[in-house]
Amino acid sequence: MLKILNAVFGVTGSGEFADWANHTTDLSSASTTVGDANKMGATTIGDAIQKAVGDNQDAFQLVFMHSKVATNMAGLKLLDFLKYTDANNVERPLRIGTVNGMTVIVDDGCPTTAADTSKAATYTTYVLGLGAIQYAPAPVKVPSELTRDALKGGGYDALVTRIRETMHPNGFSFTKPTSGYTASPTDAQLAATANWSIVADPKTIALAKIITNG
C-alpha cells in the first residue's frame, strides 16, 4: 500500500485536477539546519488535511508514519501509544497509536531520504480518510474444487477455495503497462507513477502527504 501511495502522490494534476498539488505539504528544511517548524507539530496534520480537502477533513481516520516521526511526537506528548497486557500480566505498548482522534500505524516502510552534506534527512507521513483505498474481489478461474485422496486415512476429501482481492486508491486510474503485464500488476508496476492518473475531483480524495525532518 505504501508503494501505491508513493506512486499516486507522484502524479501531477493539471486543469481541473491541478488542486491535487494541495494534498502534499512539505515542511522539510532546504538545508542541514532543522527547526521546530520543519518537524511534525501539534497542528501539522490538521493543517495538511484542511489544505488538501477543506471542509471534507472529517473523513480522515488513519495515519502512516515513520518511527522517527512517531518518537518525536510521543516525546512532545502529541502521540499516545495503545497498550496491551501480555501473558505475564505486564502492560506493553503497541506500535499503534492515536493522534488528533486518528489511528496511527508506525511503519519504517514510509518513504525517507537520507541526510547528506546539503540537506537533513526527510520523512514522509501519509494520512488516509474513509474510502481512500477501495477493496474488491477479483475474478478467479477456478474459485472452488473438490479433491479426494483415496489412500489417505481411509479416504480423504478436501474442498479447495480460492480468492483474489484487489485494493485501489480512490480517484485514480491504473493503466496496464504495454509490456511485462500478465494476470495482475507486479509490485514494481504498482509503484510506478507513470502507470497512474488522477480521474476525480481532488477535494473528494481523502489522501494527504506530509514531508518533515522528523
Where are these regions (language model features)?
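Short, well-ordered alpha-helical packing segments
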Residues: 1, 46-50, 211
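Long, contiguous amphipathic alpha-helices that act as assembly "spine/axial" helices in icosahedral shell
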Residues: 1-22, 53-69, 104, 144, ...
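Cell-envelope/extracellular anchoring and linker segments
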Residues: 10-49
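Sequence/fold signature of self-assembling virion shell proteins
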Residues: 28-43, 75-214
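Amphipathic heptad-repeat coiled-coil/leucine-zipper-like oligomerization helices
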Residues: 33-71
